[in-house]
């Protein structure tokens, strides 16, 4: 039983799961585990939180909780991966969503891969208001998982993803202090 259940790990798991489903048109039925977090007696895993991947804090509210849902138990927080499925399954509503938004700190001047879930035909990425990347398609099998190489700046960094229709999402990441 592991005390660390990072949302980003869940994202990678579901991205892989969805890609396999998209590449298997012969499947008559597919499902995901599970829509909502739910209580489980005698469970003490996934109880540690971190907003920087370095410092960890025990969160007693997550004790006795299966936290693998795509929405929290109280239905207040739609986890990143919820937007993967929203982008993939709902083509009527354009979605643009930057993942890893609860990982609020990263090392300054470091490059990293930013993931965006979107059913838009193309995306532009801005860093502090300056366009830094553009893509007209994703090679990923579901067609909704976009990866962009971006770089943190020295101070607070605001990344914004924008579709041609103006649908957008943005996150602010702060520099990790040594």
List the predicted regions and their residue ranges:
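Extracytoplasmic beta-rich repeat domains
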Residues: 142-144
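Edge beta-strands of extracellular beta-sandwich domains
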Residues: 166-177
């Amino acid at each position: 039983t592991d005390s660390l259940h990072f949302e980003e790990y869940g994202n990678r798991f579901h991205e892989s799961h969805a890609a396999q489903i998209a590449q298997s048109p012969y499947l008559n039925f597919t499902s995901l585990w599970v829509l909502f977090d739910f209580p489980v007696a005698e469970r003490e895993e996934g109880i540690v939180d971190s907003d920087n991947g370095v410092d960890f804090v025990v969160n007693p509210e997550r004790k006795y909780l299966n936290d693998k849902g795509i929405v929290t138990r109280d239905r207040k927080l739609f986890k990143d991966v919820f937007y993967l499925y929203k982008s993939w399954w709902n083509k009527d509503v354009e979605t643009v969503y930057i993942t890893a938004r609860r990982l609020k700190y990263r090392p300054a001047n470091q490059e990293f891969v930013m993931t965006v879930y979107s059913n838009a035909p193309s995306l532009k990425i801005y860093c502090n208001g300056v366009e830094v990347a553009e893509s007209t398609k994703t090679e990923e099998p579901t067609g909704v998982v976009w990866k962009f190489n971006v770089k943190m700046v020295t101070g607070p960094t605001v990344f914004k993803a924008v579709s041609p229709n103006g649908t957008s999402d943005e996150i602010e990441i702060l520099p990790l202090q040594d």
